[in-house]
Amino acid sequence: MTLRIRTIARMTGIREATLRAWERRYGFPRPLRSEGNNYRVYSREEVEAVRRVARLIQEEGLSVSEAIAQVKTEPPREQPEAERLRERFWSSVGALEGDEVTRVLDDAQTVMDVEAYCDGFLLPLLREMGVRLDVAREHLASALIRQRLRQVYDALSPAPAGPRALLACPSGDHHEGGLLVLGIHLKRKGWRVTMLGADTPAAALQGACVQVRPDVVALSFVRARAPEEFASVLEDALRACAPFPVVVGGLGAREHLKAIFSLGAQYAESSEELVAIWNQVRNAQNRP
């Protein structure tokens, strides 16, 4: 199976422009040419190599060139447990075996800590299924993963004090997996989290802000939108959330950074970035 660069970007979280820059400078990843239309396509092995490079950069602090050099020179490895679990997941989803999918999710949770389970296992599966599954299988798989993320989220004890975050997907966004992962991270950092979930209209956001008075509102945009639609949805949300600071994230927001900043919101790709933005806002408010 081969995949286009846009698909690789969605699966790995690495932007298309970044992948093309790596290819020009380092010869990595290495594309093939599809028959008939001469498009650049990539093998599943290259996708896994890109993921390993990203992990080396993020987790071990290697530079891009160091990480790519290390991955290129890696000897063939035995298939790690996480990869075996992923293969079992896709196989059982393909067979529409919901009970077996549940067993795979149980097995993964047993051998992984919370961060590895949510960020390294469940969330990548959610991102990938949209480009490799038909509607029935995607519905089965995504429902089971969201259910599992919700269980992890609910199992975390609420903080008795600490900053408060209001989390929502805006109107029209029905995929809350990334939002749940953010909520898990914030709860583990001692935040009080109010989770509104998917497809939250502006009026509901406004009512929640009035009652909760959050320190920050986090909006997760997942689906692709035209620039005009994105700006309109965000403007409505910002009016509803005023005067509270709004941080935007999600795959559907990455292509609209100019609109996000020009409308007065902030952008974050992780809980760490969100917390850093909140600290900046708080420090600015406390200045004489």
Swiss-Prot record:
The N-terminal region interacts with DNA and CarS, and the C-terminal region is involved in oligomerization and binding of cobalamin. Pfam families: B12-binding, MerR_1. Negative regulator of the carB operon in the dark. Binds specifically to the CarA operator, in the region around the carB promoter, which blocks access to the RNA polymerase. Binds cobalamin (vitamin B12), but cobalamin is not required for CarA activity. Interaction with CarS prevents binding to DNA. Signal peptide: none annotated. PROSITE patterns: B12_BINDING, HTH_MERR_2. This is HTH-type transcriptional repressor CarA. GO terms for molecular function: cobalamin binding; DNA binding; DNA-binding transcription factor activity; metal ion binding. Coiled coil: none annotated. Disruption phenotype: Deletion causes light-independent expression from the carB promoter. Forms homodimers or oligomers. Interacts with CarS. It comes from Myxococcus xanthus. GO terms for biological process: carotenoid biosynthetic process. Residues 5-24 bind DNA. It comes from the Bacteria. Belongs to the CarA/CarH B12-binding photoregulator family. InterPro entries: Cobalamin-bd, Cobalamin-bd_sf, DNA-bd_dom_put_sf, MerR-type_HTH_dom, MerR_fam, Meth_synthase_dom. Residues 162-288 form the B12-binding domain. Changing residue 175 to A: Does not affect activity. PANTHER family: HTH-TYPE TRANSCRIPTIONAL REGULATOR MLRA-RELATED, REDOX-CYCLING DRUG-SENSING TRANSCRIPTIONAL ACTIVATOR SOXR. Keywords: Carotenoid biosynthesis, DNA-binding, Repressor, Transcription, Transcription regulation. CDD domains: B12-binding_like (cd02065), HTH_MlrA-CarA (cd01104). Residues 2-73 form the HTH merR-type domain. Disulfide bonds: none annotated.
